[in-house]
């Protein structure tokens, strides 16, 4: 199967998971990116079971609304049973690198309040050690250079994310992203805490302190369900 076919496979599997495990009338947390889009497309078939969704980005909001799925502000919701999102990498503990789609801050906020985090990914995203995929760090623009120096001191190579026209990529929150290459992340929880503590960092795209509870992993043999210890 192609990577796109695997993404559709896990998107459909996630919709089945939600149908089987989340009661009718609930609100679903939804991530951002191509794999999350496959989940949204599959969720549309059972949308009448649920009140709607909490979105992690402007792009996800637009896709949800295109399917007629009501989108709630997180501030309107008392509880969120499940959050479904993709990952750029996921290790054996359920820690992830996320943020390739630029929505890492809002993704982390929604994930933090969900009772269950369901990661959906194809098998290429499973790794032994995080860090081959560049680590996104969302920064306040005035702190970009200072944060870049600190990331370089860790052994990484920070690169400002830019659009096709060469202008800096701007997040939904009005910030910029440094993509850090060359890091071998042996202790993602500690690195997440350290980088998040730097003035000027909005958030780092490490999801280790609140990692996935389970992963629906698309493989040539079908969908594998991987479960992780509590974070």
From Swiss-Prot:
InterPro entries per UniProt: NagB/RpiA_transferase-like (IPR037171), Ribose5P_isomerase_typA_subgr (IPR020672), Ribose5P_isomerase_type_A (IPR004788)
Pathway where it operates: Carbohydrate degradation; pentose phosphate pathway; D-ribose 5-phosphate from D-ribulose 5-phosphate (non-oxidative stage): step 1/1
UniProt binding sites for substrate: 32-35, 85-88, 98-101, 125
Keyword set, alphabetical order: Isomerase
Residues forming the catalytic site: 107 (proton acceptor)
Gene Ontology MF annotations: ribose-5-phosphate isomerase activity
Isomerase as UniProt keyword: yes
Catalyzed chemical reaction(s): aldehydo-D-ribose 5-phosphate = D-ribulose 5-phosphate
Pfam families from the UniProt entry: Rib_5-P_isom_A
CDD domains membership: RPI_A
Keyword Acyltransferase annotated: no
UniProt-listed Enzyme Commission number(s): 5.3.1.6
Gene Ontology cellular component terms for the protein in this record: cytosol
An individual GO BP term: pentose-phosphate shunt, non-oxidative branch
Role: Catalyzes the reversible conversion of ribose-5-phosphate to ribulose 5-phosphate.
Annotated PANTHER family: RIBOSE-5-PHOSPHATE ISOMERASE
Subunit structure: Homodimer.
HAMAP family, sorted: Rib_5P_isom_A (MF_00170)
Similarity annotation: Belongs to the ribose 5-phosphate isomerase family.
Name used for this protein in its record: Ribose-5-phosphate isomerase A
Organism this protein belongs to: Burkholderia mallei (strain ATCC 23344)
Highest classification ranks of the organism: Bacteria, Pseudomonadati, Pseudomonadota, Betaproteobacteria, Burkholderiales
């Amino acid at each position: 199967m192609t990577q796109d076919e695997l993404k559709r496979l896990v998107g459909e599997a996630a919709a089945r998971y939600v149908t089987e495990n989340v009661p009718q009338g609930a609100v679903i947390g939804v991530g951002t990116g191509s794999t999350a889009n496959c989940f949204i497309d599959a969720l549309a078939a059972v949308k009448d079971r649920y009140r709607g969704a909490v979105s992690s980005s402007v792009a996800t909001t637009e896709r949800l609304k295109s399917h007629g799925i009501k989108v709630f502000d997180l501030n309107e919701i008392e509880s969120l049973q499940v959050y479904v999102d993709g990952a750029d990498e996921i290790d054996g503990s359920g820690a992830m690198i996320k943020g390739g789609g630029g929505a890492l801050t809002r993704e982390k906020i929604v994930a933090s309040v969900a009772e269950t985090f369901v990661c959906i990914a194809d098998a290429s995203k499973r790794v032994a050690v995080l860090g081959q995929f560049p680590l996104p760090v969302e920064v306040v623009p005035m702190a970009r250079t200072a944060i870049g120096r600190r990331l370089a001191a860790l052994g990484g190579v920070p690169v400002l994310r830019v659009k096709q026209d060469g202008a800096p990529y701007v997040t939904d929150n009005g910030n910029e992203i440094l993509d850090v290459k060359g890091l071998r992340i042996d202790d993602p929880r500690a690195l997440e805490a350290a980088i998040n503590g730097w003035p000027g960092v909005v958030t780092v795209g490490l999801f280790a302190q609140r990692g996935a509870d389970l992963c629906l992993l698309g493989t040539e043999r079908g969908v594998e369900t991987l479960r992780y210890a509590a974070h």
